[in-house]
């Protein structure tokens, strides 16, 4: 992209549209991996039962359903709070699916659902007002989306998280956490650090390679 590059390994689709079906895959609810498979299995069970993490996740499932309902119908939650393991964290993941109305374009569905609720919070418009008010720096590429759209209206964009922006010989990367009424500031800050672990590890490996 001219004088900059974006690269990473996003775990979350912003929205997927295929054959007039739209999907949103909310990811919310995060525990750190321990590096021990047996302990990670215990952590996964704890995550699936954690009231705060589940409440956070269901808020975003409801938001996804609301966003898709603007120009979609026959909405279903096809995957509900599935525990998924990533390199450094464990997440709860759902899949919300809806049929797109015949009169609605793919780009309208994208507009209805952007930005992802996992990056904004809910209610979405009020949350974005608070983000603009309280965040000290612009998000830039962070929380946007990148992917493709074909001539048949099929669309697949990943949310730009767990990703780098390379510009003018500097690497920029960000992470965040969703704050709810039961959140503890120290825990949310630790979640941010946990989400950055894979990127930090990638930089460490790159430095070793070029030594």
Segments (PLM) and residue ranges:
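Extended alpha-helical targeting/anchoring segments
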Residues: 1-211
